Amino acid sequence: MKIKYFAWIKDITNIEEEEINLNKAKNLDELKTYIIEKYPDLKKHMMKEILRFAINQEYAVNNTNLNDEDEIAIFPPVSGG
């Protein structure tokens, strides 16, 4: 699956996107754990639940199952004005 990082999140990860195998994360909760382990500086943001996740361009909830073909976008809250 492909993970895409946006805004200041990609500054923390130092990459815009990466590919991971499904065996690292079968659902969104497992993916969050994987990301925290790989990028510890994101932990405080994950714990506050301020990051937003979209799977194949649809907002996702924690227990959403993942597939190898999925594209996951991770981004901060968006505000307008």
Which residues make up each language-model segment?
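Ubiquitin-like/PB1-type beta-grasp interaction modules and other compact soluble beta-rich domains
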Residues: 1-79
